[in-house]
Amino acid sequence: VPTTPGRILPILVFGLLAACAHGAAPDSPRPRVIVSTDAGGTDFDDFQSLVHLLLCTDTLDLEGLLSSPYGGGRKEHILRVIDVYARDYPNLRTHSARYPAPDALRAITKQGETEVAPYAGVRRPTEGSEWIVRCARRDDPRPLHILVWGGIEDLAQALHDAPDILPKLRVYYIGGPNKKWTPDAYHYIATRHPALWMIECNESYQGWFNGGDMSGDLANDTFVQAHVAGHGALGDYFAGGIAFQGTTRTAIRMGDSPAVTWLLQGNPADPTQPGWRGQFVRAWPRPYVVFDRITTPADRIEQFSIFELVLPPGANAPAQPEARLVIENQSLVGTVDAAGAMRFRFSPKEAKAYRYTIRSNAPALDGLTGGLTSVQPAPEAALRPDPQLPNWWTDDPSPAQMEGRLIGAKTVNRWRADFLRDFAARLERCRAPKP
């Protein structure tokens, strides 16, 4: 694979390039993988990245596809993409006998948690969390790579129910917006399982579709027109078949794909080394701030941190007080703690000012308003790795690695031509059987 970004090469040599880009020798052990996705939940990304993933299943030993959404995503959304893959499978299998049969993929597709975790971070076992435990306990010397593209509840539940599996796991977590929806499950893992091997990618993933070489057929829209549309059922589905919330996406986003390329190129065992997946630094103490009062915009917290608000329900509160913290497009359910106080958690995915309102059946809480300001982590944060998180990495906060204000995005987009070349080569396999 070239070590510096370049232009997409002519289509005739894509197949030759693919053999190099896959990174692993034909007989080398393939990495074991479970993908946890919120496909059908909050955005297009997962459907596009599922297409990418399925085209890579000759290189990966895929052991599970879990539906772990925030929102309306369900197992059936994954199965629909597998149905599209089934139409290309006759061609794909001529290029590599390692492509799994569609029925084999359907058999490992499981339903995970459909609700956000409560304050405790865990709720109950699910088919998805139990599948993680089952796979992790198999007699296999290879680590089990968990790619979390959506809610992290099933991973949290698996660790809660079977903490013995922790040494076997290697996790790449597309955090940021997903942490925003599921802060309690994330906080449970960070505080109760700090020895977990984890890449917490909060914003670097945005380099997949922001910045880098966008000239010619490398732009998000022109690449799809030139190298995706007309490339089998998967290509046509990607180029015009992904409808979500009344809109059809026809350009690249693929925001979960850095987790896939983590295992395709570079050294997966060393997140500090450059690669298509991004380049990460040891995590500093995971920011967690607690306020026992209504906050104001003068209160500053770190972007992607866990913000906790603790308020008394007041003397006239009902026997069973209820409350929600309404902030932007979220309505966060409060939890009454042992002392009777109401607790809320929130994670800001952007560096900006936020306003919130509390809705409650407790008169002292209902209608309260407040604010806070989220700020980007200081570059110096990377100089103080947390000894309590020995196997935890996150985005490089240095200005040199920012694309605009996107932290770490340049560690991904510098490779744009290379990872798009690899994707195009895989799509070529859908067009016709191997001669």
Predicted segments, located by residue:
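Bacterial N-terminal signal peptides
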Residues: 7-19
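N-terminal acidic, glycine/proline-rich low-complexity segments
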Residues: 24-435
